[in-house]
């Protein structure tokens, strides 16, 4: 299996307790929208029983020159190390894996259901399909507790506003604990939505 070295360009908070890590895409690294890959820390300052490798969905689409990985920041050695890594830090990435992708028949709509951080493969799939003008009608349902927890909510709303083929339906299940005004859907994803 081929492994590549990748360099951290920047890290940013994209929702409450959620960070995105942007890496320069290595030469020759090719993937399909919706795939994932193993990221391995190189000589981390600490480790735990879970080890130094994690599998992440690739949140960026293939047409971009960067690889973006998004995660909820939990208290593990891996995430503490990643969360404090400086620009220029190097990690290893394995070959892309998985066959989670948009079907090829544009006559059939693509309907995607995501919860929380599970939005990451759909970020790649939807942005690639919109850029390619795939012709698919796309319906992306995304459930979160609160808008504060919804990674890339604003970006997906903007993409949907620009592309008539994409309908983005975010819904919030815990607005009683939110400090933000929300006028969209509430409750779990249902057939009626």
Regions found by a protein language model. Give the residues of each.
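Ferredoxin-reductase
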Residues: 2-89, 144-146, 171-174
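FNR/FR-type flavoprotein reductase catalytic core
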Residues: 74-193
């Amino acid at each position: 299996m081929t492994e590549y070295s990748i360099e951290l360009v920047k890290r940013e908070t994209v929702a409450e307790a959620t960070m995105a890590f942007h890496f320069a895409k290595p030469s020759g690294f090719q993937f399909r929208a919706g795939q994932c890959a193993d990221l391995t820390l190189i000589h981390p300052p600490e480790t735990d029983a879970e080890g130094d490798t994690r599998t992440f969905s690739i949140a960026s689409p293939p047409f971009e020159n960067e690889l973006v990985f998004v995660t909820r920041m939990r208290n593990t050695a891996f995430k503490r190390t990643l969360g404090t890594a400086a620009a220029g830090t190097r990690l290893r990435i394995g070959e892309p894996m998985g066959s989670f992708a948009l079907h090829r028949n544009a006559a059939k709509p693509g309907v995607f259901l995501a919860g929380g951080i599970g939005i990451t493969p759909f970020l790649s799939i939807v942005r690639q399909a919109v850029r390619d003008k795939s012709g698919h009608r796309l319906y992306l349902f995304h459930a979160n507790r609160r808008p504060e927890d919804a990674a890339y909510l604003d970006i997906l709303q903007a993409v949907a506003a620009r592309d008539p083929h994409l309908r983005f339906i975010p819904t919030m299940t815990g607005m009683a604990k939110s400090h933000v005004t929300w006028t969209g859907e509430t409750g779990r994803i249902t057939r009626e939505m």
